[in-house]
Amino acid sequence: MSRWNGVPAVVLAAGFIAMNCCFSTAAEELPQPAFPCSRETIARGVASRFIDGRTFILDDGREVRLAGIEVPPPPSPMQRGTAPEGAAARDALAGLLAGSEVVLRQAEPQKTDRYGRIVAHAFTARDGVERSVQADLIAARHARVTARAGNRACARELLGRENAARRAKLGLWATSYYDSLDADNPADVLAEQGRFALVEGKVVSVRESGATIYVNFGRRWSKDFTVTILKRNARNFTAAGLEPKTLAGRRVRVRGWIEERGGPLIEAARPEQLELTDRE
């Protein structure tokens, strides 16, 4: 059963009323300096149709997926109940882009994904100022950061905006559904297999085996939550102040896609997937 079904409707309603009343001013709450996600322009156009909170169709038929963020899925006829967060994210994207030219800037080495969608950072101009669509969606509490943002400075910028949005406890952060899962409850983590999630807990040990580093959040490797880091990527974590062997005893928030390898697991390919939270 999805964690969505356990969220009281009155809590969601209150959260989304607050979110909707604050959306028009959310961007002003987080002023945007020179933006590190701005790179080579790869396309321009006007959005004509919106699939969900991060996917839209340009007027020439090309499909675009916003890089670096995850949003709730839109309501589906096959889904039990309703998903107001998904509809709110899609409506927010439409509000940001409808009728305006959108500039798409390269986010990853490959400009399109395996489905042929352009993967990009999107920008619009308002009052003569260029604004990041991803940053505005995060600031308005409609999206979470995946850390696949194209470069580390960009990921750090988006993570900072997400943390500010989380502290406001509005939108996605009004309920526990989209906040961090507890690493001490591996069954709850495993229930999200195949989905993007945030997981937080205290690291019990760090071990190496073959080409992999195992960051263990429990003593039972076959049941407890684990994060894996390939040794060839370890220097990137060390350069970011996250040397794997020093994580034991620290409280860490991890983001990524939940897999099952005995117990629940996230593979961390980028240091931006890990945040130290014992000093928050």
Could you say what each language-model-derived stretch is?
Residues S2-A9, M19-E280:
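Small beta-barrel nucleic-acid-binding modules, primarily SNase/OB-fold domains
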Residues V10-A14:
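Sec-dependent N-terminal signal peptides
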